Amino acid sequence: MPKTQTLEQTKLSEPKMYKVILLNDDVTTMDFVIEILMNIFHQNLEKASQTMLEIHHNGSGICGIYTQEIALSKQKKVMDAAKLANFPLQAKVEEE
């Protein structure tokens, strides 16, 4: 008698996505924010300038949307770079 094999189907769901948000402050320079957006979030100069102005005018701005692990990694990179440059720039991660 031939062996039969049952294949189990597993439904994969999309991972939860998280927004990385930069918060405006009165000390961090616009140039530094643009540098962060280009180096950590890989935005080109035009997009980085637009995002920086959104942060400046609205108090915060979304820099990107990622899986949780990547979002937290980018948040840490922002915080580390800001600390190294003696800026109080803050980043937060929120579920989308």
UniProtKB/Swiss-Prot annotation:
InterPro entries: ClpS (IPR022935), ClpS_core (IPR003769), Ribosomal_bL12_C/ClpS-like (IPR014719)
GO terms under biological process: protein catabolic process; proteolysis
One Pfam family it belongs to: ClpS
Domain of life from the UniProt record: Bacteria
Role of this protein: Involved in the modulation of the specificity of the ClpAP-mediated ATP-dependent protein degradation.
Family annotation (PANTHER family): ATP-DEPENDENT CLP PROTEASE ADAPTER PROTEIN CLPS, ATP-DEPENDENT CLP PROTEASE ADAPTER PROTEIN CLPS1, CHLOROPLASTIC
Quaternary structure and partners: Binds to the N-terminal domain of the chaperone ClpA.
Family classification: Belongs to the ClpS family.
Protein name as catalogued: ATP-dependent Clp protease adapter protein ClpS
